[in-house]
């Protein structure tokens, strides 16, 4: 079975890729992350993924457009609920790419993160699958999060400290420094 995996970063993708391959799936990676800012962060994550994909011979599709403006336009009216728009942007595009590329299903490395809104992502992915007529391969990879992070550190992967969006980065600094806006 051919599966297109949306990949947010190499640290989150390494365990899901191995698990799906061990299950006999033919995995292709898909990089599309208009939420990641600034451009230096975007490039660091993309470049790390490209090097890892080459190392493990993972076919990788890059939709390599730095998406600051489209992302901000999509979330600006309701910043408090930005995550749903972010998931929609990435998972609908992954479903579209999977359908057009002849894949049997799609999934995302996001499903390994204990920091993401897991059930919301699942609902968005199911809607995207229905809209594009492609299967959604659901796996809860969260039990492998720590193992994947350890693997990433051992292999010298770039390790980010926030989900990627500027609002998440702001929250990280406000919480860390206890700054009152």
Annotate each PLM feature:
Residues 1-181:
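Nucleotide-activated chemistry modules centered on ATP-dependent adenylation/adenylyltransferase
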